[in-house]
Amino acid sequence: MKNILKNIALGAIVLTASAACADMLDTAPSNQISSGNMWTTPELAQKGMNGIYETFYNRKQSNGTQVRSENLDGLNKYGIEALGFCTDYYANNYPIQLLYSEAKRANDWLVTFEWKFCYTIVHASNDAIANLGKAGLDTPTYERFQSEAHFLRAWAYSRLNKFYQGVPLYLEPVTNENCTKVQSSAEEIWKTVIDDCTYCIDNEYFPDNTITNYIGRPSKGAAYALRGMAYMWMKEYSAAESDFEAVGRCGYDLWQGKYIDFFTPENEHSPEMIFAIQYDEESGYCDNIEQALGARDTYGGWTEVKPAADFVDYYENADGTKFDWSKVPGLEDWNNLTAKQRAVFFCRDGLNSSKALASQKSQAIKICGSDVFNRYYLDNGNEARIKAAYDNRDPRLKQTIVTPYEPVDCYTPNYNGDENMIGKALRWPLYKQGTSG
C-alpha cells in the first residue's frame, strides 16, 4: 500500500518531425501520470495496481470518527461497514437510520458514498484489465495482475449487489459521458462476480494463498471464498460448500492458538487471514479505530461504535451453559424490569454517600426512576455486583469486550500529565476523565 500513486516527472515534451502537424507535440503532462501512459511500463503498472488498493484506505482519519459526510473515506468502517458489527449505535447516529427510516434518496450522502467507492474500484479494475497488456510485463506478473484486477472488480460488484440488488454493469473502460447504462438484475451481477472469481481460480499463475508472499493481495483461496459467498446469495448451497472447502485446500486454515493471541502483530499473517486490510504503526499507514470504539480516555473517543447487548449476552458461561441474567446474585428481578430500569445495576458506587456525585445520582434516577433506584442501588457494592455478571464466562468475552468496571490501560493527549492511565475503569454516570484507576 505504501507504493501508492505519486506525482512524478515523466520528462520533457519531445518535438517530432512529421508531415502531419497534428501529431507534432506529445501532450502527456510532465508532472503527473495520465491515463494515456499509466500502463506503459512495468513500474507504472505496479503503481497502477497499488492505486486500486489505495481506494480501500481511509485518508481522513484526522477528521475524527463521527459519521459525517466529510469524514467518509475508504472502506467506511464508521458508516455502512460498522453495521456489519453486532453494534449499538446511539439512537441519533446517522448510519442506524438506514435500518429504520424511510427509503433513502439516490443523493443521500451515505448511499452516494458507497456507490462512488465501489465504482471507483470497478472502473480502476476495468482500466487495468484492458491496458495491462501494454506494460511489457513478464507473463507471471501480467497474469497475476490480471487476476488481482478481476478479483477486485468482483469484490466491488459483490458489495454493490448486497446493497442495491442490481446495478449498472460495466466491464470495459468508459468515459463519464458514457456511464449511462441502466440497472442490471441482481442475478446478472452475481454471474459477473462468479465469472471473475472463476477467472482467478483457473489462472495457473495466481497463487493459492498470499500468506507469505504478496501479503495483502488476493489469491485463489480468496476467490473461492468470494465465489462461495455469491453462491450463498443465489441459494446454490452445494456449490458454495464446495468452494468453501476449496479455501482450505489452498492453504488457509482456522487459527489454532489462543483467541487473544490472534490479534497481535506477530500473527497478523495467520492462515486464517484470507484477504485482510492491515495497518502499520508508521504515520500515514495506521488506523484510529480505537478512538471510535473507546471512551473519553481512549484518544478522546465517544464510543461511537458499541457492542450490542444481545451480542454480549450470547457469550455462554465458562461451563458451556447459557448465560441468564436472573441467575446472577442480586439480579434475580432482572426480567421484571424494563431496559431503562436495569440501568440501576450499572451505576457507579458512592452515588448516595458522595456529595460530589449529586448530579450523577440525579442523572441515574432520571433514567431508572426513584423507586427502582431506592430499591436496588447499592452505595457500596453496585460495581462489584454487575462486574460479577461477566466473570466465569467464555474467556473470549473479556478478550473482545471491555465489560463494565473492568480496568484497562488508556491514553489521551494532555491528560494525566500526558502519561498512560493505568487500570482505568469507565464508571457511569461519568464524573471525571484523565486519571489512573
Give the positions of each predicted feature:
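Short acidic-aromatic linear motifs embedded in glycine-rich loops, typified by GG[WY][YF]DAGD(H)
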Residues: 22-148, 155-172, 176-180, 187-191, ...
